């Protein structure tokens, strides 16, 4: 059987849990780990960055299922108009996380 080598998990993420993700989720989570602290990128930017420019909504769905927050910083992804968009902890928590990163 041919095995495709999957990218290694981000620092602090269990390899066993990482293997339970889809390839798409892994790509999304690796991409958002590269967003610098205190900065944001849009769902569309993430989709473009992983080579799937029409998948912005799917990126949002993957982030909604992120079991590794805040190690995988989904709070750094916002809507294309710059508004916060969704976040499991609510928009106020997302805003506070971003503000804390900007001040650090």
What function would you assign to each model-found segment?
Residues 54-66:
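Regulatory, non-catalytic segments
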Residues 75-92:
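Intrinsically disordered, low-complexity basic tails/linkers immediately adjacent to helix-turn-helix/homeobox/MYB/SANT
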Residues 1-54, 92, 100-104:
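Basic nucleic-acid-binding alpha-helical/helix-turn surface characteristic of O6-alkylguanine DNA
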Residues 28, 63, 67, 91:
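Short amphipathic alpha-helical/adjacent loop interface patches that line ligand
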Residues 36-37, 67-73:
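Short, proline-centered helix/strand-breaking motifs
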């Amino acid at each position: 059987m041919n095995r495709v080598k999957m990218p290694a998990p981000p620092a602090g993420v269990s390899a066993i849990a990482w293997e339970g993700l889809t390839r798409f989720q892994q790509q999304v989570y690796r991409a958002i780990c590269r967003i610098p602290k205190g900065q944001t990128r849009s769902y569309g930017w993430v989709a473009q960055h992983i080579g799937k420019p029409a998948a912005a909504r799917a990126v949002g769905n993957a982030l909604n299922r992120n079991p590794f927050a805040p190690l995988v910083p989904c709070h750094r992804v916002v809507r294309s108009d710059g508004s916060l968009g969704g976040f499991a902890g609510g928009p106020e928590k997302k805003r506070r996380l971003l503000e804390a990163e900007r001040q650090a």
